[in-house]
Design a protein with these regions (language model features):
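S-adenosyl-L-methionine-dependent nucleic acid methyltransferase catalytic domains
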Residues: 1-209, 214, 218-324
């Protein structure tokens, strides 16, 4: 399809597979914005089975976490991101991934990452298929205690991750708090409800100058404040971790130029991708779950078709940002 004057050609694509592998297929400095929410540690399976056997005696005996293995070694032993036996391993694997992703992010690009926290328990339930309710099936994970890993301890995973990213060379520009006005009911009666999550904004460190990156403050929330109050929205196909548009649209508008490329390497059912397309950005997503990848791909196709029907864009080729 040929573009008419004033019409934007947009591309959208979802690739099924492990983000650690798929990121290698992208061109250097091809992405304007990475906007994503990795699987939270130890909370949900999203239908993918992991194994705790890789931790060996450390899991059975407790104590200090052994040195984190590379993600490839962990995966080769059957491990899944988010189901590591130690939160330290999980944080290490996230930092490892984003170190690799830095190659594809433009020098003027931004990285926005959403993370929530959790409490430690040696035996804990993992919600199946990412659903939030209490009636769905669950699996059980075992995590060894030791150090700060103590029963009922709030783990501060977002803070530990942010500091690890700083240590890895990223510049942290914002810690945006997403406050949820009506959190889901919880059975605990000895603590307050977790009713907020973090959105971290990272940019490249420049070796000889202050960081220079694309940013349009007029695209952010009114007043440019670092707290947004917004209720979660229902996801597609039972996915509970979908982004509310009111939370992610300001990230897209402020941190990527029109016609830029937005990458969500853990795209779930594709909410960030369809919102990016609506805002006249190209969109690319990676998803490990075959079910969710299919849902996301369908949503992207529908969004592109709708935009084309309204005359807002023409559909481009789908090889966005990839090696030829």
């Amino acid at each position: 399809m040929h573009s008419t004057p004033g019409e934007q050609k947009l591309s959208g694509e979802v690739r099924h597979g492990d983000a650690f592998d798929l990121i290698g297929g992208l061109l250097d400095r091809s992405v304007d914005l990475i906007l994503t929410s990795p699987p939270y540690w130890g909370l949900r399976t999203y239908g993918l089975d992991g194994t705790m056997e890789f931790a060996g005696s450390a899991v059975r005996g407790g104590g200090s976490a052994p040195e984190p293995p590379s993600y490839e070694s962990y995966r080769d032993a059957g491990g899944i991101l988010g189901l590591e036996p130690f939160p330290e391993w999980y944080i290490s694997h996230l930092v490892e991934f984003f170190a690799g992703a830095s190659r594809v992010l433009k020098r003027a690009g931004s990285l926005w990452i959403n993370l929530g926290d959790t409490y430690f328990a040696r035996w804990a339930s993992i919600r199946d298929q990412g659903r939030q309710g209490y009636s769905e099936g669950r699996t059980r994970r075992r995590a060894p205690a030791g150090g700060y890993r103590h029963e009922k301890q709030l783990l501060l995973i977002p803070a530990r991750f942010a500091i690890a990213m700083q240590d890895a060379g990223w510049i942290l520009r914002n810690d945006l708090i997403w406050a949820k006005p009506a959190p889901l009911p919880r059975p605990e009666s000895d603590r307050l409800k977790l009713s907020h999550e973090h959105w971290f904004h990272f940019v490249h460190r420049q070796p000889s100058a202050r960081p220079k990156y694309y940013y349009d403050l007029s695209g952010s929330e009114e007043g440019g404040r670092d707290v947004i109050i917004c209720a979660p929205t229902a996801g597609r196909a039972g996915h509970s971790a979908a982004f509310p548009p009111a939370v992610i649209r300001p990230r897209i508008l402020s941190s990527s130029p029109p016609a830029g490329l937005v990458l969500d390497p853990f795209c779930g059912t594709g909410r960030a991708l369809t919102e990016s397309l609506e805002l006249q950005r190209n969109a690319l997503g990676f998803e490990l779950s075959e079910v969710y990848a299919a849902v996301a791909e369908s949503a992207v196709r529908a969004s592109l078709a709708d935009l084309a029907a309204k005359g807002h864009c023409s559909v481009g080729h789908s090889d966005v940002g990839c090696h030829q």
